Each structure stands twice: as C-alpha cells, then as structure tokens.
Amino acid sequence: MRLRNIPDALERIQNQNLLVKTPWNIDDSWIIEIGMGKGKMISQLAFDNPNKNFLGVEKYPSAAVKSIKYVKKYNLSNFFILISDAKDLLDQIKGKASTIWLTFPDPWPKNRHYKRRLTYKDFLKIYANLLVKDGILKLKTDNLKFFEFSIESLKENGWKITYQTNDLHNSLVNSSNIKTTYEEKWVNLNYKIHYLEAIFI
C-alpha cells in the first residue's frame, strides 16, 4: 500500500517534542525499533516499561507522525522519534542500546537488491556497534525467504541466534509479543510470523 504523504508531518512531530536532535546520546536503558512505521508496537512497549527509553527510527515522517496518537493515548514521556535511514544511524546516535528491533522490514525480494535488506552484513555491523555487550537484535517478518537470508547473514557475520521460530504466535515467546499494525493484518489472514533473537559475539 502506498504511504499517503502528509506535508506537515515533520512539523507535527516537532510540535510534540518527540523529534530527537542528532547526534542523540543513548545508554543501555534505550530500546530502538528500526522501521517503526506507525509506532503501535514501540509505544505499547514504552507504556509497559516506564523505566526504559524508546527510540523509534523511521525513514518517512508521514508514517512516524501516526505514532502521536499512541503518545497521547498512553501519555508517554519515554518515547522519541528519529527520522533517518538505517544506514545513517552511526552518525545520528551516540552510545549503545540494550535492544534493537527490526519489525517487518522490506524484504527486497529481487536478488539484485540484496544489499538493501536490513540484515545484510553492512547493516549488521551498524547494529553491532549500537548494542551493548550481549545486547539483543530482534527480528519479526512474514517473509520466509527474507527470514532464511537473515539467519544465514547473521551466522556468517559474527552473530549467534539465541532463539528462532517460524510461528511466533504459537511459540514460547508469544505471551510477551506486541503486534505491529502490519502484523495484525497478516495474522488476521492466518499468515505465520517468523521471529528470531540474536547477539553479536
């Protein structure tokens, strides 16, 4: 589905004091979601974990602005937004986070686009530099081929997969899972969601 452009999206985010000024300093109290979309999942995490800080990274302001309704609903003071491409994160963020989420990234299915996948080795280096020792990278996707690519890429680039499942909603970790807007759509169509956790070793 094409994202509808919202001309004043960036201004609306700024007016809510949600937009971070770069470079933004973080520590191990921070959890990052890359490609947060409308922010449903990360805002719920922020509400459930008031002693932690959450940074939603989104390339498109017209998607990120939708998170404002959740900020208001939950009265959040521990959630912030960075408008950025994932490849630029080391220039935008200083410090190390405890967890990075990749939630339903574009699988870039064509072989010639494999370097754009967010689990390609160049991106994995960025995440390794943004995570504390034993920090966790978490991935959710509905695309099995992308999931398989991600598993191999992680193994080949110094990561250890500590948990994986091809059916998140019938797994041991489902009780703590918070669905994204995109995820809810596919679950209603009985799609299986693939999930993994990994640490850099």
Curated annotation (Swiss-Prot):
The active site is at 106. Its EC number is 2.1.1.33. It comes from the Bacteria. Pathway: tRNA modification; N(7)-methylguanine-tRNA biosynthesis. HAMAP family: tRNA_methyltr_TrmB. S-adenosyl-L-methionine binds at residues 33, 58, 85, 106. Belongs to the class I-like SAM-binding methyltransferase superfamily. TrmB family. The keyword Transferase applies. Substrate binds at residues 110, 142, 180-183. GO terms for molecular function: tRNA (guanine(46)-N7)-methyltransferase activity. Keywords: Methyltransferase, S-adenosyl-L-methionine, Transferase, tRNA processing. This is tRNA (guanine-N(7)-)-methyltransferase. Pfam families: Methyltransf_4. One of its GO terms (cellular component) is tRNA methyltransferase complex. InterPro entries: SAM-dependent_MTases_sf, tRNA_(Gua-N-7)_MeTrfase_Trmb, tRNA_methyltr_TrmB_bact. CDD domains: AdoMet_MTases. The keyword S-adenosyl-L-methionine applies. It comes from Mesomycoplasma hyopneumoniae (strain 232) (Mycoplasma hyopneumoniae). Catalyzes the formation of N(7)-methylguanine at position 46 (m7G46) in tRNA. It catalyses: guanosine(46) in tRNA + S-adenosyl-L-methionine = N(7)-methylguanosine(46) in tRNA + S-adenosyl-L-homocysteine.
